[in-house]
Amino acid sequence: MKRSEYLVRRRRARVAVMMLFALIMGFVSAAPPVVTGCQAQDLTPVPDTSVLSPAISVPVQAEPAAPVLPEKWVCLTFDDGPSKTTPDVLNALNAAGVHATFFVVATGHNEKYLPLLTEAVSAGHQIALHSASHEYSDIYRSSEAYWADIALLKERIAPYVDAESIRYLRFPGGSTNTVSRRYGGKGLMKQLKAEVEQKGWQWVDWNVCAEDAVGGHPSADTIYRNVVRETGQQTNCIVLMHDSATTRTTAEALPDIIRWYADQGFAFLTVAEALPIG
């Protein structure tokens, strides 16, 4: 073979090899990259921003803040009304611009005074449950007897207030009374308190007692001094008083009681304001 032919063939072979190499490299560069250690489901797709709507800022709904109570507060509460005493109590409260809480009864003997509940609500006072009969031997026979009494109370006051919305109550004799043991046994009050809480209601005791229903018809001055003495150094007070037919002097003492608490820097709250439910 002549030298010239040899050189031509060698040049052609070199060109073929170069073309093949270029073809291989082009194929490799066009192949998708392989990401070591990731599966397709592990990769986060990149959105096509050209078709996305502008971002919308959605405000975060904050939990409602719990009400902040004054450092010193007092709840004036009245049991066993309404009665002929209630108008005088309402007059004293309204004159002072003070709201109170009434734990009411509906015994069948005070029916003509029940319309006063509407007046009390209109003036901004709170109505709460006490008892229909206030007969310990009846209401504390059993849990069923107690709740039957409450149902009767709600039925009797329903024409005058929104009875179904009431979620506060006071046990006759208080939550730690021992008289209930005679009729329903030692564990009855514990059971009743648990049942009240299961309903999402609130039972309410007191830490200041006016001692206006202990018998002997205490004078207005005695009732006033009882309240001042029992308040002592306490800064959060729930005062037990009565607006029953036999506690007329409570209404007489009320202006001085209100004035004394105001002078001591107490804010006047209803029970619902001081002990909010949920």
Where are these regions (language model features)?
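Terminal accessory/targeting
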Residues: 1-75, 91-100, 159, 207, ...
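Active-site beta->alpha N-cap acidic-glycine motif
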Residues: 47-171, 274-277
